Amino acid sequence: MRKLSGAAKRWIGTSETKNNVEFSNPEFKDYIKQGGHTPGAPYCASFAKSCALESAETPTERKVIQQVLTPHSLTSLANAKKAGLYSSTPTPNSIAVFQKGTTQSGHMAVVDSVNPDGTISTIEGNIGAGGGRE
């Protein structure tokens, strides 16, 4: 998925106009629907999955994405581990999953770059106005 970041970057600047239902770019709603988004639900994972599907280079890669990634971040993480696709080392054009403590709540993002200090720069859907993850 060498083009994953590129797929995500084209949506930078898109914002919600109605909480997890309507967006400043009407095409975005249909885009995240490909990733399994249902109106009103958090859409970070659906956004990442839609970007992955767009950047898939082979039918086999597309099939794996459909099987592993879901609209729920932590379910996707469990699926990736089970499929042998998990790595704790982030790389550009990969997907990062964050867990909120020990809860079943998480967040998913596209890794754009890994910085020299080890932090990552991401492109995300469904972040709050103050930058917080939803």
Give a label for each model feature.
Residues 1-58:
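N-terminal capping segments
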Residues 58-132:
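...with weaker cross-activation on analogous glycine-rich loops/strands in unrelated enzymes
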